[in-house]
C-alpha cells in the first residue's frame, strides 16, 4: 500500500510539472525584472496564459510560461480572428520556426529564430534580433517580397527582393558581420524587368548603405543613364552621363559629388561647354558653344564668364577682349562686352577700343571695310564727343559728334585742300562757319551762315580775284539783299535772286551786318 501511494504521488508531481493545469489571463500577471509572477505571490508563474479583445471577446493570444518566462508555442490573433503570428520560445527568447501573417491571412514572413529577443524591427516590422537561417517575406498580395539568410541575427550572403508584380527588384550580398558586401555587385531592376542600377556599395556607420566604386545606371528604355566612380556615396572620379535618347550629357571628373576638373557638358538644347569645373560650376578656362554655332571661349568663375574672352557668333562676326558676366533669375548666365576689346565683322568692319554694358563706349577706333576710319569717343554704341573721321578719298573731319553724326564745332578738310571750320548739325554744315579754298581757288573764302550744307542766311564771299559779296544767301546762291564790290571799285547794291543781280535797292535789311563787316 505504501509503495502504491509513492507511485501515485510521483505521477501527480510529474503531471503537475510537465502538464501544469494553471491558466490565467496574461493581464493578471505581475512583471518584475522581465519575469512574470502570480498575482499576490512571490512565485514565478508557470502555466498557460490567454487574452481576448475587449470589444469582441475574440481570442487575442495563447501562450505558456515556465518559471516566469515565455516557453514553447505562442500564438497571437488579430481582432478579426485571423492569426497574426505564431512561434516558439525557449527561456523567454524566440527559438525555432516563426510565422507572421497579414490581416488578410496571407503570410508576411517566415523563418527561424535562435535566442531572439523581439528587438530591432526589420523588414515588415518583424523583429530582426536572433534570426538564424533562411527567412522569406511576402507582399500583402501574396507575391514574394524578400528572401535572405541570417546568422546570429545578422544578414549573410545573397539577398533578393521582388516588386508586388513578381518582378525582381534588388539583388545584393551581405558579409558575416551583417554589413553589405563591397566586393560583390549590387543590382536593381525597374518593375518592368529592365536593369536600373548595377554597382558596388559600402556600409557606413554600421547602417548607412552608399554606392562605392564603379556604378552604372540605365533608363527604363534600356539606354545608359550614367557610368562613374563613387566614393562613400558621392561621385568621385571619371563619370559619363547620357540623356534618355542616348545623347551624351556629361563626360568628366567629379570630386565629392560635384563636377570638378575637366569636363564636357552637352545641354538639352544642344549647347555645349568644354572646360574646367569647380564644385559643380563652370570655373576656369572653358568654351561654351550654342546650338546655332556661336561660341564663347572665356575664363569662368562660379558658373559665369568674366574677364578676357573670345566670342565668335554664328555669322562669324567675332570679338576678342574683356567681358562682364552675370547670373540670371532662372539660374542661368549672361554676358556683355565690357572693357577693352576688338570686334570684327565678316563684312570687314573692325572696332578696337572700349566697351561698356555691351556697347562701344569710351575711346575707340572703327575701321570700315571700305577703308574709312573713325578715331575718337563713343557713347552707348554711337560716335559721341570728340573724334576724327577720315575717308579713303582723303577727306577728313575733326570735331564733335553726337549720335553717330557730326554735331557741334568741327573742321572738315577735303582731299583737294578746301576746308570748312564751323558749326555742324545732323551731319551737315549748319550755323556759323568758314570755308577756304585751296589749289587754283586759293584765296577764295566764305564766312557766314549755313543751312543743311549750303550757304544760307547772311555771309560774305571773298573771291580769289579780290571781289567780294556781302549779304543774303539761299541754297548756296546770292539771294536777297546784298552788295557786290568788284575789283575795279564798282558795286551792285540791291536785290539778288538765284545768284543774279536784279535791281538796285536799299539794303537796309543787311545794313547792320554790313556795318559789322566794315568795323
Residue ranges and their predicted role:
Residues 16-519:
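Glycine/tyrosine- and acidic-biased, solvent-exposed loop/turn segments at the edges of beta-strands
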Amino acid at each position: 500500500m505504501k509503495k502504491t501511494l509513492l507511485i501515485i504521488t510521483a505521477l501527480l508531481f510529474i503531471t503537475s510539472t510537465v502538464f501544469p493545469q494553471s491558466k490565467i489571463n496574461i493581464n493578471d500577471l505581475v512583471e518584475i525584472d522581465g519575469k512574470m509572477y502570480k498575482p499576490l505571490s512571490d512565485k514565478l508563474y508557470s502555466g498557460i496564459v490567454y487574452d481576448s479583445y475587449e470589444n469582441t471577446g475574440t481570442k487575442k493570444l495563447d501562450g505558456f510560461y515556465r518559471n516566469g518566462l515565455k516557453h514553447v508555442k505562442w500564438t497571437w490573433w488579430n481582432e478579426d480572428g485571423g492569426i497574426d503570428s505564431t512561434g516558439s520560445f525557449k527561456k523567454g527568447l524566440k527559438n525555432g520556426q516563426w510565422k507572421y501573417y497579414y490581416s488578410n491571412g496571407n503570410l508576411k514572413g517566415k523563418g527561424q529564430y535562435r535566442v531572439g529577443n523581439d528587438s530591432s524591427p526589420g523588414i515588415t516590422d518583424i523583429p530582426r534580433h536572433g534570426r538564424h537561417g533562411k527567412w522569406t517575406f511576402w507582399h500583402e498580395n501574396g507575391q514574394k517580397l524578400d528572401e535572405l539568410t541570417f546568422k546570429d541575427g545578422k544578414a549573410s550572403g545573397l539577398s533578393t527582393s521582388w516588386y508586388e508584380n513578381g518582378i525582381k527588384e534588388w539583388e545584393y550580398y551581405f558579409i558575416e558581420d551583417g554589413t553589405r558586401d563591397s566586393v560583390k555587385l549590387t543590382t536593381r531592376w525597374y518593375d518592368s524587368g529592365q536593369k536600373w542600377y548595377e554597382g558596388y556599395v559600402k556600409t557606413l556607420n554600421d547602417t548607412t548603405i552608399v554606392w562605392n566604386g564603379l556604378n552604372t545606371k540605365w533608363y527604363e528604355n534600356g539606354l545608359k543613364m550614367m557610368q562613374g566612380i563613387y566614393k562613400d556615396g558621392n561621385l568621385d572620379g571619371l563619370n559619363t552621363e547620357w540623356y534618355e535618347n542616348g545623347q551624351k550629357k556629361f563626360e568628366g571628373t567629379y570630386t565629392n559629388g560635384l563636377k570638378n576638373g575637366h569636363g564636357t557638358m552637352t545641354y538639352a538644347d544642344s549647347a555645349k561647354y568644354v572646360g574646367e569645373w569647380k564644385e559643380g560650376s563652370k570655373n576656369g578656362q572653358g568654351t561654351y558653344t550654342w546650338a546655332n554655332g556661336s561660341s564663347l571661349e572665356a575664363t569662368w568663375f562660379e558658373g559665369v564668364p568674366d574677364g578676357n574672352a573670345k566670342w565668335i557668333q554664328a555669322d562669324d562676326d567675332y570679338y576678342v577682349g574683356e567681358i562682364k558676366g552675370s547670373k540670371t533669375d532662372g539660374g542661368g548666365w549672361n554676358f556683355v562686352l565690357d572693357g577693352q576689346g576688338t570686334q570684327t565683322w565678316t563684312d570687314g568692319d573692325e572696332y578696337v577700343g572700349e566697351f561698356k554694358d555691351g556697347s562701344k563706349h569710351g575711346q575707340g577706333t572703327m575701321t570700315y571695310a571700305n577703308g574709312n576710319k573713325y578715331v575718337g569717343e563713343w557713347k552707348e554704341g554711337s560716335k559721341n564727343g570728340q573724334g576724327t573721321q577720315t575717308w579713303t578719298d582723303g577727306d577728313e573731319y575733326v570735331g564733335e559728334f553726337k549720335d553717330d553724326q557730326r554735331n557741334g564745332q568741327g573742321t572738315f578738310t577735303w582731299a583737294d585742300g578746301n576746308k570748312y571750320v564751323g558749326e555742324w548739325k545732323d551731319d551737315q554744315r549748319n550755323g556759323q562757319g568758314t570755308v577756304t579754298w585751296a589749289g587754283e581757288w586759293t584765296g577764295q573764302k566764305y564766312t557766314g551762315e549755313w543751312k543743311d550744307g549750303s550757304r544760307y542766311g547772311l555771309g560774305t564771299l571773298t573771291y580769289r580775284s579780290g571781289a567780294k559779296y556781302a549779304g543774303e544767301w539761299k541754297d548756296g546762291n546770292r539771294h536777297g539783299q546784298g552788295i557786290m564790290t568788284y575789283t575795279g571799285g564798282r558795286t551792285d547794291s540791291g536785290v539778288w535772286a538765284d545768284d543774279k543781280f536784279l535791281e538796285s535797292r536799299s539794303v537796309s535789311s543787311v545794313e547792320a551786318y554790313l556795318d559789322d563787316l566794315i568795323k
